[in-house]
């Protein structure tokens, strides 16, 4: 790790398990954690709340610059709690429609520029673990360790389906797989900060791995050993 405040980035597509892994690493190291995707989801939710269309870049830029968002780390194994304008929105931002809206506004240069410095401000001692789609390529290109976590579209849809069923929310597996494929296309083809692995990232396919197995495989990398 560098002498500067160290950063570990975990990038990857929706449903790859990057958020779970990043939180586990942050808890293990007792570092700060940033869910960058949640910032776009919160912005999408705020835009809907204030009647701002997803194709209004200037209005979204202003909203992003003044976004009243707060993250509170969850207990071990639990996701971070997210607050928008003082109200908890942890569940609301995880809905499929919010994720799809976030993917659309994330393609806007004005939005990404407005959130860039806010994301970098999370870099505080003793260190930061962050997950997203461009953490290792754009936000923290100098990160000490970059991980790109992926999984097959079907497996990612299956995981999402299981999550929704456990929450009592109805879902269709085939529709989820189509939505994930469409989101992948948008994320990979956008002109600004497309989803891709950094040249110096370690790529890990989690399709056939349990959460604990992914974590155990990554642990040695913290000391510079990718075995």
From Swiss-Prot:
Which cysteine pairs are joined by S-S bonds? none
**GO terms, biological process:** nucleobase-containing small molecule interconversion; pyrimidine nucleotide metabolic process
Q: What is its main location?
A: cytoplasm
Keyword Membrane, does the record have it? no
Binding-site positions, ATP: 12-20
Entry EC number(s): 2.7.4.25
Catalysed reaction equations from the record: CMP + ATP = CDP + ADP; dCMP + ATP = dCDP + ADP
Q: What's the top EC group for this one?
A: transferase
Can you name a GO cellular component term? cytosol
* Gene Ontology molecular function: ATP binding; CMP kinase activity; dCMP kinase activity
Supply the Pfam families for this chain.
Answer: Cytidylate_kin (PF02224)
What subcellular locations does the record give?
Cytoplasm
* Residues that span the membrane, as ranges: none
List the InterPro entries. Cytidylate_kin, Cytidylate_kinase_dom, P-loop_NTPase
Q: Which PANTHER family match?
A: CYTIDYLATE KINASE, CYTIDYLATE KINASE/PANTOATE-BETA-ALANINE LIGASE
- Family recorded in the similarity comment: Belongs to the cytidylate kinase family. Type 1 subfamily.
- Give the matching HAMAP family: Cytidyl_kinase_type1 (MF_00238)
- The protein's name in its UniProt record: Cytidylate kinase
Encoding gene, per UniProt annotation: cmk
């Amino acid at each position: 790790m560098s002498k500067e405040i160290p950063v570990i980035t975990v990038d990857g597509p929706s449903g790859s398990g990057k958020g779970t892994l990043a939180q586990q690493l942050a808890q293990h190291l007792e570092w700060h954690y940033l869910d960058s995707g949640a910032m776009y989801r919160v912005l999408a939710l705020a835009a809907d709340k204030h009647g701002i269309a997803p194709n209004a870049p200037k209005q979204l830029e202003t909203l992003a610059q003044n976004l009243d968002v707060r993250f509170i780390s969850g207990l071990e194994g639990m996701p971070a709690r997210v607050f928008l304008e003082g109200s908890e929105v942890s569940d609301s931002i995880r809905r499929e429609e919010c994720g799809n809206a976030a993917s659309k506004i994330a393609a806007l240069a004005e939005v990404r520029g407005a959130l860039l410095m806010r994301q970098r401000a999370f870099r505080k001692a003793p260190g930061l673990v962050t997950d997203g789609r461009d953490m290792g390529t754009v936000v923290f290109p100098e990160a000490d360790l970059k991980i790109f976590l992926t999984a097959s579209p079907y497996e990612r849809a299956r995981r999402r389906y299981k999550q929704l069923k456990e929450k009592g929310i109805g879902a269709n597996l085939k529709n989820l797989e189509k939505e994930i494929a469409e989101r992948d296309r948008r994320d990979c083809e956008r002109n600004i900060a497309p989803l891709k692995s950094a040249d110096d990232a370690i790529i890990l396919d989690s399709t056939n791995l349990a959460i604990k197995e992914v974590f155990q495989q990554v642990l040695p990398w913290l000391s510079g050993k990718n075995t």
